[in-house]
Structure formats: structure tokens, C-alpha cells
């Protein structure tokens, strides 16, 4: 029997609420959420805190004891740009450790407008259900049997037909139903409703599928919750926000490049420096990167009738999302990111943007991580299963994954590490697998950008594609300190705002103190805090995550890539650096020799003599 509980109206109340949903009993309970109990934690920080409190780290990640958590950011519901991101977390069935994955879209803002800070699902439903929250904030678990077997595009359409266009949806596709270890939770994009914003990493779609939870549907609030501020606080917050807007719009990347090209603009940078993955992270320079670089990407996007400069979430001034049509003008996919262009493109020797976006659409529709699927296909090509550059074979392999007679589908749904295992790579002397802690690399060669590699080795979530915000060398830090600083910056970012906007703010001398003070206003502090307190927020999150992992059996002794010393990153030099990756286990980089001191030029008087 499905249960509906009635709750108080949350709009205009000072404290938000937590929904605790027991799927085994079909019970929904509400608790008050007081931000003062959680410091500056939002999003990822709340995930770490609640998993620490409610999850046994040794539990089966696909069992009833693994909570699935939806949490909003610290600034969600305010005027701060890009602050309406959604964090989803659980123990990862892919890595076996703690996992937070975040997404744009409208789900987090709709949660906030309903006065909901966090939703925690526990247990497992016997029957397929979905959560619906109506305009008055009343939640209900409803029968989802009619949606089982649907991919994310059709279920989004069906739900909008039932509830109207103003809903926010987070749903799994058939990859999540099949408990694929790289399955994603796909969220609706702001304005368009397209399910192209994915909390894609770590297999959280499988956790959702294991609970027989097909979707979370949130209607637009009839009386939206207002973040409590006095008139004086609101005026100060608004004035400080002008500095944030100036930093983001004045930054060449977030203010000019990304609105036109999206994050795919990264291809130009990594292509030129030799960090763009090519043929399964071979380490070679990518010879044809311009074919998927910003100029050609933009030309194809516009010539085919696509769109750019789209905000993926309410209040975003970066507007880096896009819609791509094929060469015949038919809608193909949306929200195409740098990681997808690189890993489903140059990494496979594919330089056809239509083919790349077809792979993106298939992954979004099935509900899968394009990073892990792209790297898995790269390993398959490297091992001779198909040829590099064979776009048709790659597309067909993904398209038929869930057919009953698919050879590779049951393996590919579990990601790059599973494919490598099946191909016998662990028996090879050099193991060409771009994976850390069972999670695939993001689209940066760590031999060229070592900061990313250090973060991926040491990070609690493995090769997290949002780690590496401080990707360059920082003097006087050990590799462990470099990695931890980078990860702490990332953890704070995942609590506050989008990574791109955060990067513009974090390195701006006027915006940094402004966002600190904005955090203080929400905390009710008469002044401050300073940036050291904000950085400590990120470190506190890391401590919780590392502690969880240690109890789950994941320790720093395992801080190496797939195969340990046999991984090709440690063996094969990159063309750009002429050196392999130096592991965090190897200690700091050698101190470069000091250049010789040039002789002191003679004085003019001595020259005359």
C-alpha cells in the first residue's frame, strides 16, 4: 500500500525541513533542518555528514542499508549565481566508498522553494515507485510500474504530460534499473525540461534502481520558501553579490568563452598542451584536435540549427549549456560537456561531432556516465575489440547494450574497470587502463597536468572529474598536501556553487572576501568569516569522507591507479612532458637545479681602463 503523509506548509518559515523516506515501509517523515547545526555545509558536506551518521560503511551499496541522499547547496534559494546545484550521495557500488555526485538543472531550486533541504531514502521498496511533491509541499510515494523500462527522455515527457511543464524531475533510465555500476541519475534542465543534467559518477543510478525508485518529481511551489534575512542583511547580501557577478562576467572563461562554446572550449587548451586524451590516453599529442575544437564545434552547432548560451539552472549567468542538432537539423542532444567531447571523441580517435553527440544522447537516455563509457570504449579499442576511429562500432556497442543478445552490455554497464577486467588486462605487464579506485579518469592526461593525477590518486572518490581545481603546482607543499588542498577547494565548491563560477570567484581578490561574508550573513554572523574558515570547511568534509572510506576498507595505501605500478601512467611517458606520471607515493618532485649565476658585468669606469 502506498502512503501519503500531510505536512505543514514550509514557505516563509525560518528553518527548512528534511524528508526521511523509508521505502521498505512506504513511510514519509519530516524533521526540521537547522543550518546552524551544520556550519557552512551544503550539498557535498551534508552528504558526508548524513552518510557518516546514517550509513554503515561496510554495508552492501545495493542493499537496503545504503541511504540515497538528495541535498541542496549552502546558498540554494539565494541570488548567488549557480548556487542551485543538486548533490546526490550514497556509498558507491562502483568504488565501494563514499560518493557525492552533483548536477545542474532545476531539481535543487524546486526542493528549496518547497522548503526542503535534504531528502534521504532508506530501505528498498518491493514495487517500483516514484516520489511526487505537489505545489503545496505534500509528498507521496506513487506507483511507477507504468514507467519501468522507460529511458529518461520518454519518462520526462510522460511526467510533464501528467503534471505540466513546471515540474523538476530526477530519474533513472534502464541502466539504473539494470543496476549498472556507472548508471546516473538524470535531472531536468531549467526551462527546457530536457533530462541532460546528470549526477552521473559513481553509480548512484544503480543505488536508486536497487531501491525500486524510478524518479523524484517536484512540482513548482505555490508559496516558495524565502531564505530568511533581515532587510539590512538582504541589502548587504545584494551589494556583495555585485562583486560575484563582476568576477564571473569579467572572467574571460566564464564571461566570454563558456557562454558561446560551453565547457567544450577546454579542448583548445588541452589540445595545445598535449593533455587532451587521444587513443586511450596514449600520451601522444592529438593531431586533429581542431576538428572538435571551439571554432569547428561552434560552427557545427550553429550550422545545424543548435543553440548555445543556455542556463542549466535558475539564476546562472555563465549559461554554458547547449542544444546540438545533427547535420540534418534534427535535435540530437543537450548539455554536451568537455569530458564527453574528449572521452567519446579524441580518446576514441573520433572527430565527428554528430557521432560524439549521438554517444552523449544514448548515455543520457539510458542514464549512464559518459566519462566511464568513453574510457571503457577506449580500452576496448586499445585491446583490439574494435578499431580506433570506428564511430559506427562505438555507437552500435552502446545502442545495443541492453539488448538481450548484447555481448558487451552486461560488462560495459559496469564501466571501464569492469571492461578491463573482462579483457584480461590485469595479466598484462603494462596495464593501459585510465582508472583510479575503479572510477575512470576525467579528460586530462595526468602526466601533463599532475595536479589532477594527485587528486585522483588520493581523492576519496577516485578519479573525480571535478577534483583538480588547484591543478597547478603550489610551492612548499608535499604531494599529499597539494592533493588535499586541491580536494578541499573542490569540496567547498561542491557545497557552494558551480565549479566554473567558483573558479572565477576563488581567484578574484574582491570576490573571495565577498562570498565569505555572504556565507557569514546566512550563518547570522555579525562579521566575517575569512577564507581560512571557508577552506577549513572543505578540509572537514574530506576528513569525514576519508574516515568513512577507512571504515569501508579503503585506505591511503591504495592511492594508486588501476594495476598499481603496472599502470601505463607510471610507465609510458607523455609526449608533452617526456615523462611518466610521478605517483603521490614517490614523494615531491625533485628540486630543479638553480640556474648558474651570470658574471657581474664590469663597471663603466673599469671598461674604460
Please place each PLM-identified region on the residue numbering.
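Extended C-terminal regions of large enzymes
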Residues: 7, 11, 160-170, 174-609
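Protein-protein interaction/assembly regions in multi-subunit complexes
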Residues: 11-205, 210-222, 231-251, 262-286, ...
Amino acid at each position: 500500500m502506498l502512503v501519503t503523509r500531510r505536512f505543514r506548509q514550509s514557505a516563509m518559515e525560518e528553518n527548512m525541513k528534511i524528508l526521511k523516506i523509508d521505502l521498505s515501509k512506504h513511510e514519509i517523515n519530516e524533521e526540521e533542518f537547522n543550518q546552524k547545526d551544520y556550519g557552512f555545509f551544503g550539498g557535498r558536506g551534508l552528504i558526508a555528514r548524513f552518510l557518516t551518521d546514517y550509513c554503515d560503511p561496510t554495508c552492501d551499496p545495493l542493499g537496503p542499508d545504503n541511504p540515497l541522499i538528495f541535498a541542496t547547496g549552502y546558498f540554494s534559494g539565494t541570488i548567488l549565481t549557480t548556487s542551485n546545484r543538486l548533490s546526490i550521495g550514497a556509498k558507491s557500488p562502483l568504488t565501494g566508498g563514499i560518493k557525492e555526485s552533483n548536477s545542474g538543472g532545476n531539481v535543487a531550486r524546486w526542493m528549496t522553494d518547497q522548503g526542503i533541504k535534504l531528502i534521504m531514502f532508506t530501505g528498498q521498496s518491493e514495487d517500483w515507485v516514484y516520489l511526487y511533491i505537489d505545489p503545496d509541499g505534500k509528498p507521496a510515494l506513487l506507483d511507477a510500474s507504468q514507467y519501468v523500462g522507460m529511458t529518461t527522455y520518454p519518462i520526462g515527457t510522460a511526467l510533464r504530460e501528467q503534471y505540466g511543464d513546471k515540474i523538476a524531475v530526477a530519474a533513472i533510465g534502464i541502466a539504473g534499473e539494470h543496476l549498472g555500476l556507472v548508471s546516473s541519475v538524470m535531472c531536468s534542465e531549467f526551462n527546457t525540461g530536457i533530462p541532460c543534467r546528470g549526477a552521473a559518477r559513481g553509480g548512484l543510478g544503480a543505488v536508486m534502481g536497487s531501491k525500486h525508485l524510478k524518479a523524484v518529481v517536484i512540482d513548482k511551489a505555490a508559496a516558495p520558501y524565502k531564505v530568511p534575512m533581515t532587510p539590512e542583511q538582504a541589502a548587504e547580501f545584494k551589494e556583495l553579490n555585485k562583486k560575484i557577478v563582476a568576477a564571473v562576467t569579467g572572467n574571460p572563461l566564464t564571461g566570454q568563452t563558456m557562454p558561446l562554446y560551453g565547457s567544450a572550449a577546454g579542448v583548445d587548451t588541452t589540445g595545445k598542451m598535449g593533455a587532451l586524451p587521444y587513443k586511450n590516453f596514449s600520451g601522444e599529442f592529438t593531431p586533429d584536435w581542431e576538428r572538435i575544437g571551439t571554432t569547428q564545434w561552434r560552427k557545427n552547432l550553429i550550422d545545424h540549427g543548435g543553440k548555445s548560451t543556455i542556463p542549466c539552472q535558475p539564476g546562472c549567468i555563465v549559461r554554458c549549456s547547449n542544444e546540438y542538432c545533427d547535420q540534418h537539423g534534427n535535435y540530437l542532444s543537450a548539455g554536451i560537456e568537455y569530458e564527453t567531447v574528449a572521452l567519446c571523441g579524441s580518446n576514441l580517435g573520433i572527430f565527428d561531432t554528430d557521432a560524439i553527440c549521438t554517444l552523449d544522447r544514448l548515455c543520457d537516455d539510458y542514464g549512464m556516465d559518459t566519462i566511464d563509457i568513453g574510457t571503457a570504449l577506449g580500452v576496448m579499442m586499445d585491446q583490439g575489440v574494435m578499431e580506433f576511429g570506428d564511430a559506427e562500432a562505438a555507437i552500435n556497442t552502446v545502442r545495443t547494450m541492453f539488448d538481450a543478445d548484447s555481448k558487451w552490455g552486461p560488462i560495459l554497464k559496469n564501466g571501464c574497470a569492469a571492461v578491463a577486467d573482462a579483457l584480461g588486462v590485469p595479466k598484462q605487464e603494462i596495464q593501459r587502463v585510465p582508472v583510479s579506485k575503479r572510477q575512470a579518469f576525467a579528460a586530462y592526461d595526468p602526466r601533463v597536468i599532475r595536479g589532477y593525477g594527485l587528486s585522483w590518486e588520493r581523492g576519496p572518490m577516485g578519479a573525480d572529474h571535478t577534483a583538480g581545481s588547484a591543478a597547478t603546482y603550489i610551492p612548499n607543499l608535499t604531494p599529499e598536501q597539494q592533493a588535499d588542498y586541491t580536494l578541499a577547494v573542490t569540496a567547498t565548491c561542491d557545497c557552494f556553487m558551480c565549479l566554473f563560477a567558483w573558479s572565477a570567484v576563488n581567484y578574484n581578490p574582491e570576490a573571495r572576501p565577498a562570498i565569505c561574508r555572504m556565507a557569514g550573513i546566512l550563518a547570522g554572523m555579525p562579521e566575517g568569516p575569512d577564507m581560512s574558515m571557508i577552506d577549513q570547511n572543505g578540509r572537514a568534509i574530506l576528513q569525514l569522507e576519508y574516515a568513512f572510506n577507512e571504515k569501508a576498507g579503503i585506505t591511503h595505501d591504495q592511492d594508486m591507479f588501476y594495476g598499481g605500478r603496472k599502470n601505463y601512467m607510471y610507465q609510458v611517458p607523455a609526449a608533452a612532458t617526456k615523462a611518466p606520471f610521478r605517483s603521490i607515493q614517490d614523494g615531491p618532485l625533485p628540486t630543479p637545479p638553480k640556474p648558474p649565476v651570470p658574471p657581474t658585468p664590469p663597471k663603466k669606469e673599469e671598461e674604460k681602463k
